[in-house]
A protein has these predicted regions:
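Conserved RNase H-like, two-metal-ion catalytic cores of nucleic-acid enzymes
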Residues: 13-105, 120, 296-301
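Active-site-proximal helix-loop-helix substrate-binding element of RNase H-like nuclease domains
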Residues: 67-70, 76-85, 102, 116, ...
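Common nucleic-acid-contacting/processivity interface regions adjacent to the catalytic cores
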Residues: 201-310
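Extended, Lys/Arg-enriched charged tracts that mediate electrostatic binding to polyanionic substrates
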Residues: 11-20, 26-43, 139-145, 269-288
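Short, well-ordered loop/turn elements at secondary-structure boundaries
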Residues: 29-31, 54, 100-106, 152-154, ...
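Short glycine-rich phosphate-binding loop at a beta-alpha junction
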Residues: 103-111, 241
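Flexible loop/turn segments at secondary-structure boundaries
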Residues: 43-45, 113-116, 166, 235-236, ...
Length: 310
């Protein structure tokens, strides 16, 4: 239109805009059913490749659920262990477990980059289209930051506990490693079960004793993930309320994005117009333009009275 010189706020996602325009208050009186899961795979010691390696067990943990489904039969010491004959049956059981439990939130530790992605790829390899409730639809990939490949399930919030800890809580942690073992030890006072060898090496020993221990190891990973998710959820929910963004999105943002979203939300609530995100050309020009820094007065060392702080 000739009468329109410029369009503002065109790049604000529709869902976010709708939440703010309709003054929707997110997650009030929210008491979600959380389901944590963890997978174990075969590999040659390198990072598992879904084109080659298989999923051999999946564990699930929640307040009222402890379960390990494994593709090997043996004398079981625990009622929570279920044996299936193949990976295809394992993946079908994954679908059945989620649909029966009907979680509000499903969580894994590094599930964006590993568990969810691996399950989706192996389901495709086995020619299985997962139908997950409440909409009986398959998982879908979304665009994420860096190399992350967030997986969405319609009607269920996928919370990657590791991603949120990495993006938000890591600077406050003493540990230099964000492995599940180290983070759980610092935040929960609990550690993973020691197998003595790497999981894919432990899988080679099919004795009853070892397979029971392998199942315990797999289940504990899910339990630790569940407990961590419970611990971080109140913080994540507050960020959702501050920014007006759904939990799936807000838990995958770093502080810079969170602050930006809070400013956008505040501006819209104050009926202020928000400029569009700058183009690449504008960003290059801004970086090329240098501004003189402010004068910083260096005080003489000593003891002073009547100090004013701005």
């Amino acid at each position: 239109f000739e009468s329109v010189s410029e369009v503002f706020e065109a790049d604000i996602p529709y869902i976010f805009r709708s939440i703010l325009d309709n003054k929707i208050k997110l997650y009030e009186n929210f008491n979600p059913k959380i389901l944590a899961f963890d997978i174990e795979t075969t590999s040659d010691g390198n990072f598992p490749d879904p084109l080659i390696d298989e999923i051999v067990s999946i564990s699930y943990y929640s307040k009222n659920l402890e379960k390990v489904t494994i593709i090997r039969d043996f004398k079981k010491e625990h009622d929570y262990i279920k044996s299936v004959a193949s990976e295809k049956e394992l993946l079908k059981d994954f679908q059945e477990t989620i649909n029966k439990f009907e979680p509000d939130i499903i969580t894994g530790y590094n599930s964006d980059r590993f568990d969810m992605w691996f399950i989706k790829e192996r389901a495709s390899k086995n020619e299985i289209k997962l139908k997950l409730k409440p909409f009986d639809e398959d998982m879908i990939y979304t665009q994420g930051a860096r190399n992350d490949k967030p997986v969405k399930i319609k009607g269920i919030t996928h919370l990657d506990t590791y991603i949120f800890i990495r993006n938000v809580l890591a600077p406050r942690l003493k540990t230099n490693s964000l492995s599940l073992d180290n983070v759980a030890e610092e935040m929960l006072g609990q550690k993973k079960l020691e197998l003595g060898v790497l999981p894919h090496e432990a899988w080679l020993d099919d004795s009853d004793e070892n397979m029971n221990k392998f199942s315990e190891y797999n289940l504990l990973d899910s339990k630790l993930t569940y407990l961590l998710a419970e611990k971080i959820l109140p913080i994540a929910l507050q960020f959702s309320r501050f920014t007006g963004l759904p939990l799936f999105d807000v838990t995958r943002m770093r502080y810079g994005r969170l602050v930006e979203q809070f400013i956008i939300k505040s501006a819209i609530e104050q009926d202020r117009v928000i400029e569009n995100r700058p183009s690449n050309d504008k960003i290059i020009k801004r970086r090329a333009t240098q501004a003189e820094g402010a004068f910083v007065y260096q005080p003489t060392p000593g003891v002073y009275k009547n100090i004013r702080v701005f």
